[in-house]
Amino acid sequence: MKIFSCALAARERLAALALNLGRQTLEGVAPSLRPALLLDRFGRAEAFVGQWARAPRSVGALCPSGVHLARRMAAMLPPGDGLVVELGAGTGAVTRALQACVAPERLLVLERLPAFCRVLRSRFPELTIIRGDATRLADYLPPNRPVAAVVSSLPLLSLPGPVQQAVVGQMRAATAHGGCIIQFTYALWGRSPLVRAGCRREKRGLVLRNLPPAKVECFRSF
């Protein structure tokens, strides 16, 4: 009952947010297109809240990642033409930022929840969207295709220990030949599970213009 009440309250806040920020988010958009754009954005946020209410540990956050967080993650992508794999894409906030930096054929998006997969396929019909589990990442990677980066929005700290270890192991294996792992977390202090698993942190940055504020880190698995 408590989770349900939180979800309803969040839904009301999202509606208020859409109205209060309408002038800013719709600036430059043709008036005839504004209702559809608002409906699309609110629909994606509502889908996110609904999934959080049903499975809070697997979603990890009440709201989708903000645009500033998504852009910071995309800015950490390494140069080159290798495959970029996104884990836990949700409703596509980070996917959109990655798409602005990476050709569609280089981007592989993995999402476990069916509702989010439907949203992703609707928003990004040109991308490869796979419904799958990050603990089996190796099963979805094309053969003989080097992975330049794994970009993860998975809530590593809230995953059960064995699942967390399996996911981290899959990310390390996928990037073992020179790739990097880009991970964000709402835990602004403390060591990442990736560091505990032996990864070396190369970069990090705080994104204060996100709700809640987040930390983005880039790791190498060797």
For each of these PLM feature ranges, what is it?
Residues L120-R121:
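Conserved SAM-binding loop
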Residues Q165-H177:
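A short glycine-rich, Lys/Arg-flanked "PGG" loop and its adjoining helix->strand segment in the class I
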Residues T91-A103:
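Conserved SAM-binding loop of SAM-dependent methyltransferases across substrates and taxa
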Residues L113:
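Conserved SAM/SAH-binding beta-strand->alpha-helix loop
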Residues G178-T185:
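Conserved beta-strand signature within the Rossmann-like core of class I S-adenosyl-L-methionine
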Residues R41-L77:
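Class I SAM-dependent methyltransferase Rossmann-like catalytic core
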